[in-house]
Amino acid sequence: LMINGYFDLSVGTVMGFTAALAIGLQPLSIPVAIIIAIAAGAGIGAINGFFVAKAKINAFVVTLGSFIGVRGLIYIYTGENALVGQNYEFYSFGASRILGVPTLFLIMLAFALIGNFALRRTAHGRRTYAIGGNVEAAENAGIPVDRTIFLNFMLCGMTAAIGGVLLASRLNAATPGLGWPDTNLMTIATVVLGGTSLTGGSGSVTRTLGGLFTLGVL
């Protein structure tokens, strides 16, 4: 999304809200809870994308509004209390290891590889770079600018939701303050530290991983 020239201030609250859904909806079954949580994240991202790409409202205003709105949803859904998971399999997955390596770390690497491939080897990735570099030139070249921006916001919400579900699995709990406000700033700092321009048009997933590890050491 930042390569596209935009950023999303609602990532942290989306992460916290979807973590709460993944814990609170466990009585329906774990797969249903996970699907609803990820769908909610994608839906919030789609709403952000609609107002930014279609309604042409500033992304800062839109995503700040989403941040506040979703934070309210977290308080309403949790009743301002911590939710504790009741499913051992859900928790054991978050704490599991494969050949001594945490499963969640391997999932992160898998998503990084997929994201890197999508950016470098697909038409959508090339469109993302083009729009971030020069949106007017991209429009003149026939690139579907609005659709690309919309999809990137939706993908941002969906991946934040996946992160929320995985975090809930690791902690086996969700609190009203989980995922925000530090997640938003840390996310932007990690991406910028990895070499992505705040104005868009440059950056990569692999360099962002480098920024993540560097920030972790610091």
Language-model segment annotations:
Residues A20-L21, G65-Y75, N140-G142, G216-V217:
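Small-residue-rich segments of transmembrane alpha-helices in multi-pass membrane proteins
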Residues A55, A59-T122, T148-L151, R170-P181:
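Transmembrane helix-bundle core of multi-pass membrane transporters
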Residues L1-S29, F50-I57, V191-V205:
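Single transmembrane alpha-helix segments in multi-pass membrane proteins
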Residues S29-F67, A110, G210-L215:
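Alpha-helical transmembrane segments within multi-pass membrane transporters and channels
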Residues I114-M154:
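Membrane-helix/interface signature in polytopic inner-membrane proteins
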Residues G24, A46-K54, I76-Y77, F117, ...:
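Membrane-interface helix caps of multi-pass small-molecule transporters
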Residues A160, L171, T175-L218:
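Transmembrane alpha-helical segments in multi-pass inner-membrane proteins
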Residues V70-G72, I107-F117, F153-G164, T190-T196, ...:
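Hydrophobic core segments of alpha-helical transmembrane domains in multi-pass membrane transport
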